[in-house]
Design a protein with these regions (language model features):
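Loop/turn-to-beta-strand initiation segments
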Residues: 59-60, 178-182, 227-228
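Active-site glycine- and acidic-residue-rich loops that bind
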Residues: 113, 117, 163-165, 212
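Intrinsically disordered, low-complexity acidic Ser/Thr-rich regulatory segments
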Residues: 151-180
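Conserved P-loop NTPase nucleotide-binding/switch module
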Residues: 181-219
Length: 228
């Protein structure tokens, strides 16, 4: 097999915590990563530290505050910034666009289906990231669709003519397997399915509905995350 998208060869992003980077073999890899821990064990603090690392590396990122409990003063102290707008941006007084563009997009959406479909929609608009063993290089692979070619030009990427002849697709060499987008959900247990309503007054039924919806929505997203 001349082509592989093995995550072991890919880029790993620092968590900004040396010990955790060592435990995770260099940092966060592409794909699905879950931080488990008891209540008040530091999961949200880790998420805030991760935001700082993402912002510094200019990786398009999204913070999904499903709990709706982000303490902006605490977040600034952890991240070492003076104002949370340094991350989330500041909207224009007119309400149109941003006065200060966001480095990280913020939403407090907590409906499970909406969150995963939002993530899926963004990932589907990104080209596949592929490591080729025959060349020993990373590539972003674009189709010949108009939207793909426009994105390729906007990013200033040039395709490999030889690979285009072989495959009929645009293979654009990139320095490493750095992931193209990151999503921080704080937290998964705070997401609720749209089916859980007043009629689901029994806790056991609500848990079952959440589990079923999660299993359905997460599969396509996990696959896309590893490819992007």
């Amino acid at each position: 097999d001349q082509i592989t998208a093995s995550i072991d060869d890919g880029y790993r992003m620092s968590t900004s915590l040396l010990v955790l980077d060592m435990i995770m073999n260099g940092g966060v890899r592409s794909g699905w990563v879950t931080s488990l821990g008891l209540e008040a064990s530091g999961k949200s603090s880790l998420a805030i530290k991760m935001m700082g690392s993402l912002a510094k590396q200019h990786i398009p990122s999204y913070f999904i505050d499903a709990e709706g409990a982000l303490d902006t003063e605490y977040a600034c102290a952890i991240a070492g910034i003076s104002d949370i707008t340094e991350y989330f941006g500041r909207k224009s007084p007119t309400g149109k666009g941003y006065e200060l563009p966001p480095k990280i997009r913020y939403t407090d959406e907590n409906i499970l289906e909406k969150v995963f479909r939002f993530i899926k929609r963004i990932l589907l608009n990104l080209p596949d990231k592929v490591y080729r063993q025959d060349t020993g290089k990373w590539y972003l692979k674009f189709t010949r669709d108009k939207s793909d070619t426009e994105m390729m030009k906007a990013l200033g990427l040039k395709h490999d003519a030889k690979l285009y002849t072989q495959t009929g697709q645009y293979w654009c060499e990139v320095p490493h397997g750095k992931f193209q987008a990151a999503f921080i959900i704080d937290s998964l247990p705070a997401l609720v399915t749209s089916e859980v309503g007043e009629e689901s007054d029994k806790e056991s039924k609500a848990i079952a509905l959440d589990a079923r919806a999660f299993a359905k929505e997460v599969k396509p997203v996990r696959g896309l995350l590893r490819r992007k």
